[in-house]
């Protein structure tokens, strides 16, 4: 290895290697003689030659008694004006050209990097990639070659890897939308006075793991007692904060909204009960792909909306004196859709097809309310969700040749437990404070979610 200066310009002789073989010879400095710079005697050969000398001085000149080229020749590049040049006199054999792994490259033309070699002197391709660049040896004339580097653009393999990571983060967003939408079907306002009106104000906090995300919202619920056996209502759930997985941003602009209706067999709530409810959520969603290798940090804006519809049949009865038990069975249809979009801010943007998850599920379990005191109650539920039908699109993107769609529904859980526990406290006959925590398994990638909800209810 030579990293300094060897100057034999006044000696009249070249630098001579006379015996043995050289595995790797690296010249990061300068060697200069009157005649050929380096002379190899007899059959002595070099396995790998790495060279930085040339552009900022004279080219590294080689001659050999057998004229045998090194097995591998790697140019060392420090900048567009500082790189290796090789001048080989009357060569025989062949060499494989490459770029030294420690080089600092930029797009452009590196002139006369090799002189003295014909096309037949090269083994293998005279083009390739180095980092995020493509390179090609350009035969500008005779036996003179320029090296041309240009940005290679994102490779299909690296883009596929970044797409797989985006799919994982988007599954987290779909899980979050599913958790929030399904929990909203439990919103109710059932405390009435002489006017048959009810209003509830509260706050919701939801969290999802794998990948981690959370959101909080202010919730307003209204109820109206149509008759002793029928009541209706609606709600608004306005997000105030969203902490989404990396590369995902969900806006707080649009509230989730929904409506519900109950029919009870008896005015006191015992016996059969039929409930129908729906919820609608529409959010602006922004994505940024992770950079993996040559892939680009593509940005995109789209919308994420979910719709859920629930029909529930239950039967309430008293167990002993202080406990109300309500077994239930329900059917729920949920649709979560991300609109199609095209990335911006990159040289090779990806275009994504719409992504939709449609699920019909059966829900069964039991709810209870246990009177702790005349004013305080313990409430809770235990149940299971079973998917009856599910259709999930694949995450499909185009824009880079060779991409394949990602299986968005991989590791999907079709049977999911759900449980809740909470308490209510009647401040007065027409005022109630309540809190509840619900925990459930979510559909995508072995994920659990939890929601805490606290509200203050007033009856009129």
Which sequence ranges carry the predicted segments?
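Solvent-exposed, glycine/polar-rich loop segments of beta-barrel outer-membrane systems
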Residues: 242, 246-248, 282-302, 337-358, ...
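Extracellular, surface-exposed repeat/solenoid domains
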Residues: 61-153
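Glycine-rich beta-solenoid repeat tracts in large extracellular/virion proteins
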Residues: 1, 12-20, 32-43, 57-65, ...
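Right-handed parallel beta-helix
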Residues: 1-7, 23-32, 47-55
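Outer membrane beta-barrel translocator domains of Type V secretion systems
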Residues: 155-321, 325, 438-439, 443-445, ...
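Primarily extracellular Gram-negative trimeric autotransporter adhesin
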Residues: 32, 56-67, 141-193, 389-408, ...
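Outer membrane beta-barrel transmembrane domains
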Residues: 258-259, 352-460
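Polar/charged side chains located within well-ordered beta-strands of beta-rich proteins
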Residues: 2, 27, 49-51, 272, ...
């Amino acid at each position: 290895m030579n990293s300094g200066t060897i100057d034999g310009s006044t000696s009249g002789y070249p630098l001579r290697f006379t015996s043995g073989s050289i595995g790797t010879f690296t010249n990061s400095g300068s060697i200069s003689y009157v005649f050929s710079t380096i002379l190899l005697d007899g059959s002595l050969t070099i396995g790998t030659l790495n060279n930085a000398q040339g552009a900022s001085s004279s080219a590294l000149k080689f001659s050999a008694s057998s004229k045998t080229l090194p097995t591998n020749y790697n140019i060392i590049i420090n900048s567009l004006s500082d790189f290796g040049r090789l001048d080989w006199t009357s060569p025989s054999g062949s060499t494989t050209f490459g770029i030294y792994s420690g080089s600092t490259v930029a797009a452009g033309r590196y002139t006369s990097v090799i002189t003295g070699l014909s096309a037949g002197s090269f083994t293998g391709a005279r083009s390739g990639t180095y980092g995020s660049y493509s390179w090609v040896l350009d035969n500008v004339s005779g036996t003179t070659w320029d090296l041309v580097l240009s940005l290679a653009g994102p490779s299909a393999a690296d883009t596929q890897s970044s797409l797989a990571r985006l799919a994982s983060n988007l599954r987290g967003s779909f899980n979050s939308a599913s958790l929030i939408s399904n929990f909203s079907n439990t919103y109710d306002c059932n405390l009435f006075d002489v006017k048959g009106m009810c209003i509830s104000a509260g706050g919701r906090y939801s969290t999802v793991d794998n990948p981690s995300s959370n959101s909080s919202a202010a919730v307003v619920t209204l109820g109206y007692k149509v008759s002793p056996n029928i009541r209706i209502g609606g709600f608004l759930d306005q997000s105030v904060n969203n902490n989404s997985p990396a590369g995902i941003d969900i806006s707080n602009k649009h509230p989730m909204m929904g409506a519900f209706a109950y029919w009870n067999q008896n005015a006191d709530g015992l016996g059969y009960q039929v409930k129908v409810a729906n919820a609608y959520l529409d959010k602006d969603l922004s994505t940024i792909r992770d950079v993996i290798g040559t892939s680009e940090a593509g940005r995109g804006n789209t919308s994420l909306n979910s719709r859920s519809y629930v029909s529930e049949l239950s039967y309430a009865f008293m167990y002993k004196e202080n406990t109300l038990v309500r077994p239930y069975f329900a059917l729920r249809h949920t649709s979560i859709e991300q609109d199609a979009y095209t990335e911006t801010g990159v040289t090779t943007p990806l275009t994504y097809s719409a992504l939709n998850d449609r699920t019909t599920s059966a829900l069964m379990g039991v709810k209870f309310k246990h009177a702790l005191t005349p004013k305080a109650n313990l409430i809770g539920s235990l149940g299971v969700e079973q998917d009856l039908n599910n259709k999930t699109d694949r995450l499909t993107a185009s824009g880079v040749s060779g991409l394949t769609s990602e299986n968005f529904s991989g590791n999907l859980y079709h049977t999911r437990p759900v449980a809740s526990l909470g308490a209510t406290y009647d401040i007065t006959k027409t005022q109630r404070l309540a809190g509840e925590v619900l925990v459930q398994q979510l559909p995508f990638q072995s994920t659990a979610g939890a929601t805490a909800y606290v509200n203050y209810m007033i009856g009129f």
